[in-house]
């Protein structure tokens, strides 16, 4: 059995179709849909995952994403609630992805508008939110690379990083990519 069939067996064709149709529940971080998406992400080729998430980043409404990551909007702070170095991990991955993209303020994080601190271990949730918003709006490929790395290395952080709407977009894109690839592979 090939990788695609292994993934289909683990996730289930019905779950993939549910993701593709945008009918998954990403409201609750512990939902079965969230766990299935994390499993799919862990099994994907990192480059394919990065490409799909970069395309998804371009579809995320910038205001909706900003509202998700900005501390205090809607009385939430999803990045600030992360424990065990999760915030610093997201900050380091984002900054590294932007530096690798190598253009504009991304290669010089101190030039990101409003950013107070560029040391990932000392950044607060507001600083990480500024970097995330900047990456999502200005460098979607770097944002996709960061999301892929976070999703594969620390999948539990992905919901706080992306938010439910972006998770739903990513799940639909990943399922569509997987279903398309499955149709191309020999049975």
Regions found by a protein language model. Name each.
Residues 1-187:
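Amphipathic alpha-helical interaction segments
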């Amino acid at each position: 059995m090939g990788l695609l069939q292994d993934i289909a067996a683990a996730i289930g064709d019905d779950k993939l179709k549910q993701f593709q149709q945008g009918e998954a529940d990403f409201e609750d971080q512990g939902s079965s849909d969230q766990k299935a998406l994390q499993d799919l992400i862990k099994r994907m080729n990192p480059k394919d995952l990065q490409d799909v998430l970069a395309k998804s980043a371009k579809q995320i409404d910038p205001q909706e994403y900003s509202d998700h990551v900005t501390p205090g909007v809607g009385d939430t702070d999803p990045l600030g609630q992360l424990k065990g170095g999760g915030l610093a991990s997201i900050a380091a991955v984002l900054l590294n992805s932007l530096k690798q993209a190598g253009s504009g303020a991304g290669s010089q994080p101190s030039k990101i508008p409003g950013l107070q601190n560029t040391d990932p271990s000392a950044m607060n949730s507001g600083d990480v939110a500024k970097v995330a918003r900047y990456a999502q709006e200005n460098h979607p490929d770097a944002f996709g690379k960061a999301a892929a790395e976070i999703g594969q290395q620390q999948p539990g952080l992905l919901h706080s990083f992306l938010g439910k709407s972006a998770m739903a977009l990513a799940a639909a894109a990943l399922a569509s990519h997987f279903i398309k690839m499955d149709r191309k592979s020999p049975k």
